[in-house]
Curated annotation (Swiss-Prot):
Classification lineage: Bacteria, Pseudomonadati, Pseudomonadota, Gammaproteobacteria, Enterobacterales
Signal sequence, start to end: 1-17
Lipidation (N-palmitoyl cysteine): C18
Designated name of the protein: Lysis protein for colicin E1
GO cellular component, one term: cell outer membrane
Membrane-topology annotation of the record: Lipid-anchor
Lipidation (S-diacylglycerol cysteine): C18
Function statement: Lysis proteins are required for both colicin release and partial cell lysis.
GO terms, biological process: cytolysis
UniProt keyword list: Cell outer membrane, Lipoprotein, Membrane, Palmitate, Plasmid, Signal
Keyword match Mitochondrion: no
Pfam families per UniProt: Lysis_col
Native organism: Escherichia coli
Length: 45
């Protein structure tokens, strides 16, 4: 049960981190396109 709890927290942290990266890519994509935006297929204008 305790192990499952830690796995849940880890998954949430991972999702939040990805979300923050995505937002950063969208906002700053025009100035400095990051490698992660290319990997996820986000078009950089």
């Amino acid at each position: 049960m305790r192990k499952r709890f830690f796995v849940g927290i880890f998954a949430i942290n991972l999702l939040v981190g990805c979300q923050a990266n995505y937002i950063r890519d969208v906002q700053g994509g025009t100035i400095a396109p990051s490698s992660s935006s290319k990997l996820t297929g986000i078009a950089v204008q």
